[in-house]
Curated annotation (Swiss-Prot):
<comment type="similarity">
    <text>Belongs to the chaperonin (HSP60) family.</text>
</comment>
<keyword id="KW-0067">ATP-binding</keyword>
<keyword id="KW-0143">Chaperone</keyword>
<dbReference type="GO" id="GO:0005737">
    <property type="term" value="C:cytoplasm"/>
</dbReference>
<comment type="function">
    <text>Together with its co-chaperonin GroES, plays an essential role in assisting protein folding. The GroEL-GroES system forms a nano-cage that allows encapsulation of the non-native substrate proteins and provides a physical environment optimized to promote and accelerate protein folding.</text>
</comment>
<dbReference type="InterPro" id="IPR027410">
    <property type="entry name" value="TCP-1-like_intermed_sf"/>
</dbReference>
<dbReference type="Pfam" id="PF00118">
    <property type="entry name" value="Cpn60_TCP1"/>
</dbReference>
<feature type="binding site">
    <location>
        <position position="494"/>
    </location>
    <ligand>
        <name>ATP</name>
    </ligand>
</feature>
<dbReference type="InterPro" id="IPR001844">
    <property type="entry name" value="Cpn60/GroEL"/>
</dbReference>
<dbReference type="GO" id="GO:0005524">
    <property type="term" value="F:ATP binding"/>
</dbReference>
<keyword id="KW-0413">Isomerase</keyword>
<dbReference type="GO" id="GO:0016853">
    <property type="term" value="F:isomerase activity"/>
</dbReference>
<feature type="binding site">
    <location>
        <begin position="87"/>
        <end position="91"/>
    </location>
    <ligand>
        <name>ATP</name>
    </ligand>
</feature>
<feature type="binding site">
    <location>
        <begin position="478"/>
        <end position="480"/>
    </location>
    <ligand>
        <name>ATP</name>
    </ligand>
</feature>
<dbReference type="GO" id="GO:0140662">
    <property type="term" value="F:ATP-dependent protein folding chaperone"/>
</dbReference>
<dbReference type="InterPro" id="IPR018370">
    <property type="entry name" value="Chaperonin_Cpn60_CS"/>
</dbReference>
<dbReference type="InterPro" id="IPR002423">
    <property type="entry name" value="Cpn60/GroEL/TCP-1"/>
</dbReference>
Amino acid sequence: MAGKEIIFREDARRSLEKGVNALAEAVKITLGPKGRNVVLEKKFGSPMIVNDGVTIAREIELSDPFENMGAQLVKEVATKTNDVAGDGTTTACVLAQAIVREGLKNVAAGANPMIIKRGIEKAVDKAVEAIKNSAKTIESKSAIAQVATISANDEMIGNLIADAMEKVGKDGVITVEESKGTTTNLEIVEGMNFDRGYISPYMITDADKMEATLNDPYILITDKKISAVGDLLPLLEKVVQSGKPLLVIAEDVEGEALATLVLNKLRGTFQCVAVKAPGFGDRRKAMLQDIAILTGGTVITEEVGLKLDKATIDQLGRANKVRVKKEETIIVGGAGSTDEITKRVAQIKKQIEETTSEFDKEKLQERLAKLAGGVAVIQVGAATETEMKDKKLRIEDALNATRAAVEEGIVPGGGVAYISALKGLDGLDAGSLDEKTGIDIVRRALEEPLRQIASNAGLEGSVIVEKVKNADPGIGFNALTGEFVNMIDAGIVDPAKVTRTALQNAASIAAMILTTETLVAEKPEKEKDTMGGMGGMGGMGGMM
């Protein structure tokens, strides 16, 4: 069995620092409007060209196990920031590297790392408070477009996301998909949609589009499998008398029940489309209830004592229009009461707040969107697959940044929010010299994002930082034009949530690295000499 290799004190910290630097140097060249790209090798297919911090960080694995630990810790800064805020991963890596670099200098000079850590935490809390206090709420479409434009570094993408948000609202779902063409466009799906299509192709009304359209239909919603026609007959007779079409949403429709529906459709007696209920298990029950509330119907389920053969026409839902495709059903203009829908939306929002599972949160968010607004799909097009992947990543980042901005407001971009937060550290009381050192480390680190943006634009970072520090509040450096401007007026803004999260995560991991004294890793196994057993072949000469 391979043993373990252990390194201590200064050697341990230096190895971690090398790993931190390796990852941060690769990521930070992408920061700002003049940031460069990174090319990632792929085992299959063409290399990937990206400008996204977390995607680059995820690809980095170092051969030295101790240095790799440092790189993996910074990777955690990037992924955690991405999970919470959806953007700001490069900034988080830059901040983490700065805190580690300054901190290790002081630890090597004899400072107590535990007390430095206390100073770092105190300063970060104060800086985060300053960032939150300076945040401005955003409402207008143009402000949303500015946030998205800065994140994606592309005005067209910014406007596209602002359009999508305007159409589906803050609670709406916006998904990003790869397009077949070369243009990027926005598609809005109005009403509630779910990924189940017609059970039988005989039910279609438009042979060219291969879809069924029902105008002003009744909607039967049940969690039961329908196979006996007797269960449906009493209800079918009432629907036929009304002269309206019928949409059946059930666990399944099969056997003679399906044959009866298809036969009536083909004879022209009445129009009916059957689809399977969306989702599985408890989620299916919840989604059927959502559809019932949206359409003003009742879920016919034996759990509450309702039987299909006793169902009345009053228990059916209504909608202005229903479109059923091969794999999708869209209900437009449900006749449900606005009060009931509002209550249901509030209930789902509460569940989103309480759930800890990311998967559940995502599914609840989808249900919320279908009830509250609709779904917007951004179709990403490009001339090559490599460009498309890069564009898709940028759009996803911009979308996350925009959601974060709507949630917690915006602050001046271009690293200016961190420079402004420096003033909040001025009167901070340090209990000891080492604690003051911790505060000063954060003070220096807060300048680093602006310094890096200027450096990527080919300028001397320290000069730009000093000019911004001495300028009026809100004035920053526009790296694209090389001018000093009011950042919010110029539309250079960052979401407060992204700015805050990047600093908190960077400080958390960096402080852990500073207080590390020992590293333990697997000892690499020496490769066995596979040719060693061939030595005995020298005796083959006597075989003649």
